[in-house]
Amino acid sequence: MRLFTHGQVLALLAFVNTISAIPSFSTNSYPAHPAEPVSLVSQHQPQAPLGLWTRLRNSVIERVWGVPPQQRHRGGNKHQYPPFSAPASLRTRYGDDVVLRFKLQTADEVKALVEASNILFLDVWSSTDEWIDIRLAKDVVPSLLGLLPKSLQTTHVPLIRDLPQTIYESYPSPFQSSSGHERGFLPSGEPSSDATNIFFENYQPLSVIVPWMRLLASMFPSHAQFISIGSSFEGRDIPALRVGVRPANDQKPRRTLIIEGGSHAREWIGVSTVNYVAYSLITSYGKSKPISTLLEQFDFIFIPTINPDGYVYTWETDRLWRKNRQETSLPFCHGVDLDRTWGFEWNGNVTGDNPCLESYGGDKPFAGVEAHQLAEWVKEQTEQRNAKFVAFVDLHSYSQQILYPYSYSCLSQPPNLENLEELAMGIAKAIRLTNRKTYAVSSACGGLMASQKKKVKSETFLRMESTGGSALDWFYHDFGVKYAYQLKLRDRGSYGFLLPRENIVPTGNEVFNAVMMLGRFLLGKSRAFQELDWDAGFQRPNKDDKPILNDDDDDDNDDDDDDDDDADTNDDGIGRKDDSWVPDEYKGDNDRDESDGGWGFRRLRKR
């Protein structure tokens, strides 16, 4: 008799290792916001015996976390919990830091904000052609505003008002929620079991991810293989999964896609999303004809994080660390930005003399150890394993954008621009019909820079950071991958890099459907492929939603419910307009014209 299913074994491994990997901030600290109480072993419950899985889970929680038995109110069923707040160690590290969003209208505003950020050594979280998010200490706000023009002094809103608390809440909780928002969906649209979903109910540390990947490959050896891309600066393997079914006597070049996340260590949602898509494809092979067809026609390389050293560092030391952990010319400034160190149009001369910058690309092309390892690996696969890389998808956060080449300059256009845009718009539509989340479509330079609009006929692009040396541009231009994209995942800034764990599965649904759309596009117009029931392969959390591939759907008229995380309009949540700590002389009515600030699809290419 089999005691556990495949999913339960994977979940058991993930859960036990996750609990042991949670940072021990304080002996008196507790996880934030438990959605539903967990019945512990030490609590007497005569009404029903606990199953083996439940007892094992609860005993791990009680032993490792030291959670006391839950007490019930007399005559009621409500549970009491000890207070939970960010421990002193987090508050010591992050102090009273906040995250502000500045809305932009002119190139002069961008220039002033860039200069002020460099002077004050501020952490720029994200930037688009409409806004810039900056992390800084509250007591630095007056200094920053004093360096800015009057037009920017009253047009900022706080996104995160208590950074230490928000960071604390991003770590795994030992309380398992039964909320429907945290349940995963298999490609059939049916909710998967709670045991299977334990892995995706929380973000996972590398010490959990690697054994989980190995176990997944061992359970599905016919179409999944655990591999190492190379070694990191600190000697860790760069883990990956190769997923696909290649005919025994097939000598043709094997078309291969790379799905990569975690270049920037603090972007945890990218890591979890790579794992989610890999798991969904692996476990659906043989059950879904479209998915089986994709795995028979392509190899998928899933790399949860190309930056294992940095990712571990975000769990053990600094949740907001971005770069890798290699040494630089300055002993007190570690790390290279692994998305600014690639060889094509590397412009390290912009940051080459300052290793302390977040976007430091190294002192030469491919100075980043892990980027060099991946570049050498794909070359070796092409030369020795007869692989033909046809697509590259680089997952980042945040801002909900689908970006295509080029990143280094808006003055250059890719030769197959029409096809890149067509596919990007199809991916955006698939995402929107999954969870009604709108992703903007743009060239990478347009998504990473701010432009002066309505002032001159030709747009002037200003860089918030170095944009050369990107993986996107190298794979497309130097390595010849015809379809290369960077997806910036949820959200639009309410939480930024600290996206709550409730978003793991919905984001996974969205990117899974994006990958399905990409695969369908790459298969071409062969009748045998087009006649497949592709909608049966897509993940649809709400069965009443429109089919993903309904060609009659009107993108412009479809209801868009994607307004729940607009940080600058949220009066109650983390983006509330609380400006009590902003000097009075910098407060204003914030009544600027925002008529052109919509979130619809934006096609920014220059003709």
From Swiss-Prot:
Kindly give the PROSITE patterns that the UniProt entry links to this protein: PEPTIDASE_M14
Q: Which GO terms describe its molecular function?
A: zinc ion binding
| Residues given in the record as Zn(2+) binding sites | H264, E267, H396
Instruction: State where composition is biased (Basic and acidic residues).
Output: 573-590
What GO biological process, any one, is recorded here?
A: cell wall organization
Q: Cellular location of this protein?
A: Vacuole; Secreted
Cofactor binding note from Swiss-Prot or TrEMBL: Binds 1 zinc ion per subunit.
Enumerate the Pfam families for this protein. Peptidase_M14 (PF00246)
State the source organism's domain of life: Eukaryota
- Named cofactor requirement(s): Zn(2+)
Q: Show the GO cellular component annotation of the record.
A: extracellular region; vacuole
Q: Where is the Peptidase M14 domain?
A: 202-522
Q: Which keywords label this protein?
A: Cell wall biogenesis/degradation, Disulfide bond, Glycoprotein, Metal-binding, Secreted, Signal, Vacuole, Zinc
Instruction: List all disulphide bridges recorded for this chain.
Output: C333-C356
Q: Which residues are glycosylated?
A: N349
Q: Which residue ranges are recorded for the region named Disordered? A: 539-607
Pro-peptide residues, renumbered to this chain, are 22-174
Q: Which PANTHER family match?
A: INACTIVE METALLOCARBOXYPEPTIDASE ECM14 (PTHR11705:SF147), PROTEASE FAMILY M14 CARBOXYPEPTIDASE A,B (PTHR11705)
Known function:
Inactive carboxypeptidase that may play a role in cell wall organization and biogenesis.
- By what name is this protein known? Inactive metallocarboxypeptidase ECM14
Please give the organism: Ajellomyces capsulatus (strain NAm1 / WU24)
Q: What is the lineage of its organism?
A: Eukaryota, Fungi, Dikarya, Ascomycota, Pezizomycotina
Q: Which gene encodes it?
A: ECM14
